[in-house]
Amino acid sequence: MGAPYDFAPERPDHIQQILDGLDRYNPETTGVFQDYVMQQCESQTYDCYANLALLKLYQFNPHLSRDETVTNILVKALTMFPSPDFALGLSLLPSHLLAPLNSSAHNPAAGDAPLSEAVQKLNELRNLLEGADYATFWSTLDSDDLYADLIADVSGFEELMRVRIAATVSQAVREVDRSILESWLNLEGSDFEHFVGSVCGWTIEGAKIKVPMNKDNEAKGTVVRENVKFDQFARVIKRAYEQPA
């Protein structure tokens, strides 16, 4: 049985107390939650439940919202791909932030980009990940200085994304071409070999990468049996011949 959705092993006691009581709806706790988001970014920890509680506070108190904190929450949610955390975060944002912008009319410097543009940029990355278009994910990430600004606060973002992509790949295949996996992980040479061998525990055999068998990538036949009683089948036949009222 998996851990509860609101569980976070690294959650501090004072955050747990806020989440367990009515103070989670108290605007005065906004600053505490914001500091906790920054702590997660720096320490490579993650607490979806607390982050969603902060976004809910922003919903009720939009004047307290901080753009940087919102984007940091979404970037942290990306590092948990393929979980639905990013979509949950989007659902708590104002609808106008999700409306497409006219790129010709909105082309500010990276540091001055509006929150709506930042949210849509991150959503584009999410869509690429969900579509398993990992090579385009990396090229898109490198295509705009705004992306560099958005992920700057999240320590180890690229490494975290490689781990998540590798985990997803291991659920689907047992062998993959080296060139393809290099594009998926955005790594080459010794860096690629170290990640594949030491981090993933996979084997490099020439131009192929071997992924160990696991419960997800093992090919197994499935037999499904359905027991239908004769009287149930008879009722279906009878209804087929009944005249409509």
From Swiss-Prot:
It is found in: Cytoplasm. GO terms for cellular component: eukaryotic 43S preinitiation complex; eukaryotic 48S preinitiation complex; eukaryotic translation initiation factor 3 complex. GO terms for molecular function: ribosome binding; RNA binding; translation initiation factor activity. Keywords: Cytoplasm, Initiation factor, Protein biosynthesis. Gene3D superfamilies: ARM repeat, domain 1, Winged helix-like DNA-binding domain superfamily/Winged helix DNA-binding domain. The keyword Protein biosynthesis applies. GO terms for biological process: formation of cytoplasmic translation initiation complex; regulation of translational initiation. Residues 46-227 form the PCI domain. InterPro entries: ARM-type_fold, CSN8_PSD8_EIF3K, eIF3k, PCI_dom, Transl_init_fac_sub12_N_euk, WH-like_DNA-bd_sf, WH_DNA-bd_sf. Belongs to the eIF-3 subunit K family. Component of the eukaryotic translation initiation factor 3 (eIF-3) complex, which is involved in protein synthesis of a specialized repertoire of mRNAs and, together with other initiation factors, stimulates binding of mRNA and methionyl-tRNAi to the 40S ribosome. The eIF-3 complex specifically targets and initiates translation of a subset of mRNAs involved in cell proliferation. Component of the eukaryotic translation initiation factor 3 (eIF-3) complex. PANTHER family: EUKARYOTIC TRANSLATION INITIATION FACTOR 3 SUBUNIT 11, EUKARYOTIC TRANSLATION INITIATION FACTOR 3 SUBUNIT K. This is Eukaryotic translation initiation factor 3 subunit K.
